[in-house]
């Protein structure tokens, strides 16, 4: 899990993981679970930036 986070944190651009984290989101490889909503992407379409509302 930690390795996955490091891999997902290695980009830029909300199209980058750092921007996603600054907006209070997390990068997820699948669709956003439960009460979370997609607010952007981390590495293009496959990786979503999700945040709880």
From Swiss-Prot:
One of its GO terms (biological process) is cell chemotaxis. Its main location: secreted. Disulfide bonds join 20-49, 27-42, 32-50. It holds the Pfam family Defensin_beta. It is found in: Secreted. GO terms for molecular function: CCR6 chemokine receptor binding; chemoattractant activity. InterPro entries: Beta/alpha-defensin_C (IPR006080), Defensin_beta-like (IPR001855). SUPFAM superfamilies: Defensin-like (SSF57392). Keywords: Antibiotic, Antimicrobial, Defensin, Disulfide bond, Secreted, Signal. It comes from the Eukaryota. GO terms for cellular component: extracellular space. PANTHER family: BETA-DEFENSIN, DEFENSIN BETA 4A. Has bactericidal activity. Belongs to the beta-defensin family. This is Beta-defensin C7. It comes from Bos taurus (Bovine).
